[in-house]
Amino acid sequence: QPMVVIGAILGAVMFYFQGCEMWNVGSVGLSSLFGTTLLNCFLIPSTMSMDIRGWGEMFPLNGPCWSLFFEYIAYVLYAFIFRKVSTRVLWWIVPLFAVGLTYAAFQGDYCNLGWGWALTKENFIGGMFRLLFSFTAGLLISRTYHPGIIKHPFVIGSIVLVVLTFMPNVGGHKYNWMNGIYDVFCITCAFPFVMCVGASATAISDKTKRIATWLGDLS
């Protein structure tokens, strides 16, 4: 994807010219920087030993690419497996993946679902559960949900998202288990609700429709 390549190149430039005490570019050879940039361009994850920033990231020059990496895995799984899975089977496996997601939320010291950004066992398992639940739940909703008439769906969805993002962490370090419950609730209940509400939005202006279509095509 062009945006992946552009992001990797920009990341390499910014890393090289904005070095600091934490990210000492002087300790990174040009060959290592070039190799990491090339891996990022082709969306090939870096191992812990190959990370040039010291955080152990899959994609140290364009961190958010880890999410796109798991999306590519989803595309492969859909092409070979999930598109053939019946709706009845989805009703069984979605709750199972939700259990796995809950398990992932309570691993580590912080009780959250911020897994998937590093090529470690814990991060890969956590990232896969995030992927498997969200993707299969989306398939199930697309097959079974029939949009109805909901008044002000945009307002409702926006308010829910604003409220959720105002609470990025719940319970603090002492009661971090509360944050695990909150993260699981958001992914398994709140976000699917927002998606269903948004799918019920039909009465939109031509201008809004063109903007939404353009954003969808851009994505």
Model feature map: region roles:
Residues V5, I9, V13, V76-F80, ...:
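Generic alpha-helical transmembrane segments of integral inner-membrane proteins
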Residues Q1-V4, S219:
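Structural motif
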Residues G7, V89-D109, G157-T165:
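Small-polar-interrupted transmembrane alpha-helices in polytopic inner-membrane proteins
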Residues E57-F82, L131-F133:
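Function-critical hydrophobic alpha-helical transmembrane segments in multi-pass membrane proteins
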Residues M48-W55, I81-V85, G114-S219:
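Alpha-helical transmembrane segments in multi-pass integral membrane proteins
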Residues M3-F70, G100-W115, K121, F185-A199:
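Membrane-interface helix-loop-helix regions
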